[in-house]
């Protein structure tokens, strides 16, 4: 049976379609691999039920997150991910376009480094019943469903009361996602290998206006303060809205034992990458 690879492209990126065709031809002619193509900028009717050798993403970090969401939805987390950057920053998509042939060739020679990126898990409860149980690679955001309205939430750490936040929202982020929205909201950048996660309030109106970093053993619980509840809040996982919830729900966060396998081709140090991409 012929081996297969999954190619996820974002055709909204200029040149993505042409480069996708080049990658497809290269895989099929040199490595005799059949390519299944998905355009993540369009609605997907069904996910292909195949055993893929690897996944290639072609776009920016947003394309990677959309492709990862497809893998998580279909419980296909073991597949190696080759992320080719056609965006600007490219923390997740860090392989240069001109290197795609080298990366593919080295994959078949088993001479590439695989970096494991762990996932953040959230469970949404209401009266003890699970409403949502999902994973995110970058971050999970809770904010008011109404424009210009704040949320009031109470935070527990390992079932112990800790803080109350009055803010525009709350970001819970992995180290991988710490360079994204959390960083823009004033949070710290964590090295991707750090085994922990962080919570950052968005525009807080409280004394506690700093981020907190927690170990992988910690479990966080957020609930709405009934006294100050104004409107339902929406939850976003890696930028995707998974619904709005009212006063009686509890959001529980923890680091998952599951991880994703990202192919690494970058030899730059963590510090050098930050300087090149952020400064």
UniProtKB/Swiss-Prot annotation:
Binding, NAD(+): 61-62, 138-139, 149, 166, 168, 179-184
Keywords annotated in UniProt: ATP-binding, Cytoplasm, Kinase, NAD, NADP, Nucleotide-binding, Transferase
GO biological process: NAD metabolic process; NADP biosynthetic process
Cofactor(s) annotated in UniProt: a divalent metal cation
Subcellular location: Cytoplasm
Top-level taxon of origin: Bacteria
Catalytic activity: NAD(+) + ATP = ADP + NADP(+) + H(+)
Protein family: Belongs to the NAD kinase family.
Name the record gives this protein: NAD kinase
Species, as recorded: Borrelia garinii subsp. bavariensis (strain ATCC BAA-2496 / DSM 23469 / PBi) (Borreliella bavariensis)
């Amino acid at each position: 049976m012929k081996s297969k690879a999954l190619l996820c492209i974002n055709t909204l990126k200029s040149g993505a379609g042409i480069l996708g065709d080049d990658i497809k031809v290269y895989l099929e002619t040199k490595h005799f691999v059949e390519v299944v193509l998905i355009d993540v900028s369009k609605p997907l009717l069904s996910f292909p039920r195949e055993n893929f050798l690897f996944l290639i993403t072609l776009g920016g970090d947003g394309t990677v997150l959309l492709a990862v969401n497809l893998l998580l939805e279909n419980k296909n987390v073991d597949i190696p991910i080759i992320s080719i950057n056609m965006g600007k920053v490219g923390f997740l998509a860090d392989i240069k376009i001109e290197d795609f042939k080298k990366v593919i060739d080295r994959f078949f020679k088993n001479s590439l480094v695989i970096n494991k990126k762990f996932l953040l898990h959230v469970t949404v409860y209401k009266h003890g019943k699970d409403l949502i149980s999902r994973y995110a690679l970058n971050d999970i955001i809770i904010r008011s469903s109404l424009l210009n309205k704040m949320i009031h939430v109470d935070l527990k750490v390992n079932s112990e009361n800790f803080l109350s936040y009055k803010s525009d929202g709350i970001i819970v982020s992995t180290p991988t996602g710490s360079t994204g929205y959390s960083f823009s909201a004033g949070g710290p950048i964590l090295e991707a290998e750090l085994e922990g996660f962080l919570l950052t309030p968005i525009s807080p109106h409280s004394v506690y206006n700093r981020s907190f970093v927690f170990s992988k053993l910690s479990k966080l619980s957020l609930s709405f303060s009934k006294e100050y509840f104004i409107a339902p809040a929406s939850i976003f996982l890696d930028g995707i809205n998974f619904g709005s919830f009212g006063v009686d729900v509890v959001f529980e966060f923890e680091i998952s034992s599951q991880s994703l396998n990202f192919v690494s081709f970058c030899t730059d140090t963590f510090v050098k990458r930050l300087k090149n991409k952020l400064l």
